[in-house]
Structures are given as structure tokens and as C-alpha cells.
Amino acid sequence: MIDSPPLPELKKLFPFQSRYFKTGRYKIHYVDEGSGPVLLLMHACPMWTFAFRDLIWKFRKNHRVIALDQMGFGLSDKPLDFDYRLENHTAILESLIRSLELHNITFIMHGRGSTIGMAYAVRNPENVRAFVTLNAMAFSDFRLPLRLQICRIKWLGAKIVMGIDLFTREIKHMPPDVRECYEQPLRSHESKNAQLRFIEDIPTVPEDESAQSMLEIESSLWMLRAKPSAIIWAKKDWLYTSKCYEKWKQYFPEAELYKLDSAGRYLSEDAPTQLASILTEFLRRYQC
């Protein structure tokens, strides 16, 4: 299914055909550009495929570039009655990959997108060519920052998330048209609900709903160690800190390591040239 982007700003900044994948009653937005070896881009929260616009434009010349919006984010549907647990996001990714018949995939994953992407990868290692992780949560021993701990308080969390832009302070310095493309999809009640469910689904104790899924993923990461891999880390990210970086180094001791000194939560906006250069060389070196 093909549609036109609803934001006027996107015609200039995001000149890609919007496509939609049906999953049950809902639509998942994605872009599918170029041809060649497959790159699958997975965004962090509360970002969306817009964060990868420069990479899509650059790599579509020699690759087939797929980038999808997670349920509840970007231009995907934002149903109030959807179960936003990790397992369901992973199921959507699996369905999309099957539907598009994607094979020998190189994943480029950021934040929550890394968690979902790795959930797929450990279950389908034969379909993974290589992977690059940008700042992401450790699968165990992850401590929520205080601002998100407060959002887990039952009587208070919804009021905070519905009333405050928790994740967008870093974009205030961006050009107005870029800022609008990030902020507009986050303003609705339905979008705020998806942000809250994301926060609530981050496991902090073994009893949390997605804790078992996270541990199962972590225990299976060894299967991917022979794959070409890289870890790219923004040093100023307040959510996924150096402690997470050290865990990812333990997961993949042979991975190429890169640190971006001046980049923060919105890594692709803070260091676009550096990020593109690292990825270009990685893809060339491993012929991905």
C-alpha cells in the first residue's frame, strides 16, 4: 500500500515514497528505496524513519534500504488498544521481513530498534549478514534514568508523559522544519500513549512483562558473534550511557568500536557526516 506523507515539510526533507504494511487492523509505515544488498534501518524511540533520511538517500544508490516506523511512532498507526510489548513489535518486524522477502540483511539499529532487531536476529541468524548498533539498552542490568523512573509510578506516569515532552528537549536547537517533522508525530494523545507504553515495557525487575524476553535475547547473542558488526556510540546520550556501551562490548568483543564525542540522543542529527562515513566504510569492508 502506497500513500503520500501527511506533513508538508516532508516533501522537501523526506523525499521518499511512503508505504504501508497491514498487520491486523493496523498500518505500519515504511520506506523501500533502491536495489541491491538489503539494509534494514530500525529507529530509536520516540524517533522515526525521518531520523535516517540522510542514510536512506545516500545508501539507496547501491542498496535496497528499508526503514520502518514502529507501531505508535512516526507515520505508523498509534492504536490505544495495541499491546506495545517487545514481543509484539518483534512479531511485526518478522511479518514485514517475510512479506517483503528480505534476505541476507544488514541491520542498522538505534535504541529500541536495536532491541527489536536483535530479537529477530537471534531467532533468524541465518538471515543476518551483518549488524551495526547505535546507542542501545543493555539487555540486563539496565537502570532507568530518574526522569523515566518517575514515569513508572502508576498514578503519576500518565500525567507526566501526556503533559511533558520528555524526549524532545534535544531537538530545540534544530532548524524549525526539521524540528516540526520530529515533534508533529508526537503531539497526539495516541502518540503519548505509545511513549508511555515504551517506558513501561523497559524491564527493571525480573517480574516485568518483557524481562524474560530480554534475557532470552541476551543469552542467545553469542550466535551472532561471527557476523560482521560495529558499535557506534554517542557519548552525550542521557538514556543509553557508557554502562550500556560496556555491556555491548561484552556481547560482541570482536565488533568495531566508534565513539562520537559531540553526539547525543539524536545521534543522526548531531553527527550525520561522521555516522555516514563510518557506515560507508563498514559496508565497503564487509561487502554488505
Question: Model features per residue range: what roles?
Answer:
Residues 255-288:
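Catalytic active-site module of serine/aspartate enzymes centered on a nucleophile-bearing elbow/loop
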Residues 142-197:
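Helix-rich cap/lid subdomain of alpha/beta-hydrolase
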Residues 191-250, 259:
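Conserved serine/cysteine hydrolase catalytic core
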Residues 42-44, 110, 233:
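The conserved beta1-alpha1 loop
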Residues 1-39, 60-63, 98, 102-103, ...:
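Alpha/beta-hydrolase fold catalytic core
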Residues 21-24, 31, 67-109, 277:
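Active-site loop/oxyanion-hole signature of alpha/beta-hydrolase fold enzymes
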